[in-house]
């Protein structure tokens, strides 16, 4: 399918290295970004990292606001503060929730956004999309893509291993997401970008290679993962949608998040969904599952405390989460019996 217009939204600069948060002011000013600046962060992150960043901005006008979750209430709070202080640039310092709030507010008020992630837990650190609770759906919405990403590997490598593994899980999901995209292009005439899809798959390949590296050198492994997450976000920016990074595995994850909220990390659910959807696609799901085990990702629902019936129910409703997004689940989805069989044969449930 040919598109009349295709807009590619990419970062202007990506800074990646060790102890580079000390250079943040230099980076910001080199991009000709002006104050007042608003730093969106979290309570824990502020104590460890954000206060250090604020010291670097002592000659600039800087405001700080703390958020806990990516909800529309938090978005409204941050937006009100940004407008009241006539903010020109928003800097997100934290994990996925904080980054999502920061870039969604930047999108709503038309200001530049800088991403400074503190955990490599998902590819939202780069993408022009955000997941915000309270908008009536658990899927991603358009947001402001970062003009710059500042990825300090020492900061990212200090994140809990579970968050690092979740980032691997989220990135592995590109394997089935791209296959779903190809299916939608073939059966529904959707736009499909071969180069963009290849970039997403390369991200998944590098994420899978992290297991061996992380065990030997955490910082080296986290650098590979961070670059994979950035590449995945870039793929979404090039595609103009989340298609190369989000397919049936994400629909399953979103279904779990609705049925059994706040019990698992997003990347952990995507990882489970990837095993299940790989099975349906006829992809070598056993190889994917084996790689996940090596990383330390959960491969069974009970490892996350999720009841079997929730897994089955999620499989039966996943196709309804985003009806306009065609995937291997089709328009009708799975019956309870089919869902139970798939979940058992893949070992997700006993």
Curated annotation (Swiss-Prot):
Uppermost EC category: oxidoreductase
Swiss-Prot/TrEMBL GO biological process terms: glycerophospholipid metabolic process; phospholipid biosynthetic process
Keywords of the record: Cytoplasm, Lipid biosynthesis, Lipid metabolism, Metal-binding, NAD, NADP, Oxidoreductase, Phospholipid biosynthesis, Phospholipid metabolism, Zinc
Binding site for Zn(2+): 170, 250, 266
Pfam families: Fe-ADH_2
The family this protein is said to belong to: Belongs to the glycerol-1-phosphate dehydrogenase family.
Subunit description: Homodimer.
General function of this protein: Catalyzes the NAD(P)H-dependent reduction of dihydroxyacetonephosphate (DHAP or glycerone phosphate) to glycerol 1-phosphate (G1P). The G1P thus generated is used as the glycerophosphate backbone of phospholipids in the cellular membranes of Archaea.
Name of the featured protein: Glycerol-1-phosphate dehydrogenase [NAD(P)+]
